Amino acid sequence: MRSGLEWNEDYVDGSVSDVIEMLASPDMAALAAAKPLEHEPGTHFYYSSGTTNIIARILGDHLGGRDAMEAALQDQLFRPAGMTNSIPKFDQAGTFVGSSFVYAPVRDFLAFGELFRNGGMAGEQRVLSQAWVDASVREHSIDDESGQGYGLQWWLARDEFGSFCCNGYEGQRIQVVPPLGLTFVRVGKTEADYSDDLRAFYNQVAQAFA
């Protein structure tokens, strides 16, 4: 999220939004990568779905393209983690839309959170290294607007429990609360104006298990 590329992540009706344009593009990573450089790379944090899809393109190209990327997701992550009904979606250029498009039931999203709560283990099987999990949920940046910390594709919740979370559109969320042995998922739809109320709600959920 510190690529330095110009980007507008707003989803508000009537705004000039790069993310809306990107999601309608046949080649999402190319659109994001073509944006002008606004800051020196590594110096400025700004949440960008475009950056996520650039990363997905780089990884997909390294693995050998669309089919290889899908096989890696299913064979090395989804199925070992217990995400047996998850479907990754790709754009017309063959890039996994990592920012936005994994179709999955709540159980599978829960399994993803549990994988990180358990340090990369799914039952007795190691799926991700402990080092990767630790790096993912360690603060690397701070979002100036919200004050939240950001790791590697994970947000840090800034609560008393040291929770970390995946934040989706309009309140979708996977929240992991390691000290309480708790992972929970929300798939509701709430407008951004109520984001402070949502954060209070998530904290109340955790408090109920404390």
Question: Would you name each region that the model predicts?
Answer:
Residues 38-47, 96-103, 166-167, 191:
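Solvent-exposed loop and edge beta-strand segments that line ligand/cofactor-binding
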Residues 168-210:
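Structured C-terminal helix/loop/strand segments within mature extracytoplasmic catalytic/sensor domains
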Residues 51-59, 100-121, 172-188:
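Active-site-proximal alpha-helical segments within enzyme catalytic domains
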Residues 1-82, 106-110, 114-115:
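Active-site-adjacent helix/loop patches that line small-molecule binding or acyl-intermediate pockets
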Residues 5-6, 52, 93-96, 116, ...:
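Solvent-exposed loop/turn segments at secondary-structure junctions
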Residues 26, 83-90, 133-183:
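Active-site Gly/Thr loop motif
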Residues 72-137:
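Active-site-proximal binding-pocket segments
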